Regions:
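Short, exposed beta-strand-loop hairpins at the edges of beta-sheets
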Residues: 92-117
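Beta-strand signatures of extracellular beta-sandwich domains
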Residues: 60-62
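Exposed aromatic-hydrophobic patches
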Residues: 48-50, 84-93
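Short proline/glycine-enriched turn/loop motifs at strand-loop junctions of beta-rich domains
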Residues: 54-56, 96
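Short proline/glycine- and polar residue-rich coil/turn motifs
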Residues: 78-84
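Transition segment at domain starts
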Residues: 1-42, 121-122
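Solvent-exposed strand-loop boundary residues in beta-sheet-rich modules
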Residues: 65-67, 108, 122
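Surface-exposed loop/edge segments in extracytoplasmic proteins
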Residues: 68-77
Length: 122
C-alpha cells in the first residue's frame, strides 16, 4: 500500500476539528500486526492522523461495537494507505459512540491488524 495524505476540499484538520466528539489511539492486534496513530470522530467524519499499520492485503476500516466480530461491524471502506493521514465517513444512519472501536481488518484472511477504542474527547 502507499502513503496517503487526503487533501479533499472537505478535509478535516486539527484546525477544523477543534472540538472532537470521540478520540482513540491505535494499538496493534498482536506481535505480527502493528498499528499506531490517532483517530478523531466528529459527527460522521472520521480522521486518522499520524497513522501507520503493518502492510497487508485487502485491508478495510470498520466501526464495531464492543465485543462484536469485526466482519459484523460497519464497513467504512477500503484502507486508503498503510501510512499517513486519511478521512472516512460513517455511512447512512449509523453513528459512533464511546466504547466502540475503529478496526483495521484484513478481509481476505479475516484478521484484525489494529484497533482504537473510542472515548469522549477531553
Amino acid at each position: 500500500m502507499k502513503k496517503t495524505d487526503s487533501s479533499s476540499p472537505d478535509e478535516m484538520t486539527n484546525d477544523t476539528m477543534k472540538v472532537n466528539e470521540l478520540v482513540g489511539i491505535f494499538q496493534g492486534a498482536d506481535e505480527n500486526h502493528d498499528a499506531k496513530g490517532k483517530v478523531s470522530i466528529s459527527g460522521k467524519n472520521i480522521r486518522l492522523e499520524n497513522f501507520e499499520v503493518t502492510n497487508g492485503p485487502d485491508l478495510y476500516v470498520y466501526l464495531v461495537e464492543e465485543g462484536q466480530e469485526t466482519k459484523k461491524g460497519i464497513s467504512l471502506g477500503k484502507l486508503k494507505g498503510n501510512i499517513g493521514n486519511q478521512n472516512y465517513k460513517i455511512p447512512g444512519d449509523h453513528s459512533a459512540s464511546s466504547g466502540m472501536e475503529i478496526v483495521i481488518w484484513c478481509k481476505q484472511f479475516n484478521v484484525d491488524f489494529g484497533r482504537a477504542e473510542l472515548g469522549k474527547a477531553m
